[in-house]
Amino acid sequence: MLKKQFVVYGIVQGVGFRYFTWKKATEIGLNGIVKNQRDGSVYILAEGSASQIDSFRDWLSHGPPSARVDRVEENDYSGTHSFGLFSVEH
């Protein structure tokens, strides 16, 4: 299982981005979290197989129709915490 951190920048708050991210991650079968950041970005921690992460990364590059994704930063997550079902944090 891979663990990846993503930070998505653009018009990604107030447009349903967290909900659609949760929906896509759940469809793919990922575990993890999604939450808004104070700087206007969205933080995502995703855990899954390489093919699941690849599919999710492709979706994040454009997001839902209501959003405008300018860029996505990706890093490996080195923490030891395991996540349950994908959830939205407030």
Curated annotation (Swiss-Prot):
Gene3D superfamilies: 3.30.70.100. The active site is at residues 18, 36. Residues 3-90 form the Acylphosphatase-like domain. The keyword Hydrolase applies. The keyword Zinc-finger does not apply. Keywords: Hydrolase. GO terms for molecular function: acylphosphatase activity. Its EC number is 3.6.1.7. InterPro entries: Acylphosphatase (IPR020456), Acylphosphatase-like_dom (IPR001792), Acylphosphatase-like_dom_sf (IPR036046), Acylphosphatase_CS (IPR017968). It catalyses: an acyl phosphate + H2O = a carboxylate + phosphate + H(+). It is an enzyme of class 3 (hydrolase). Belongs to the acylphosphatase family. This is Acylphosphatase.
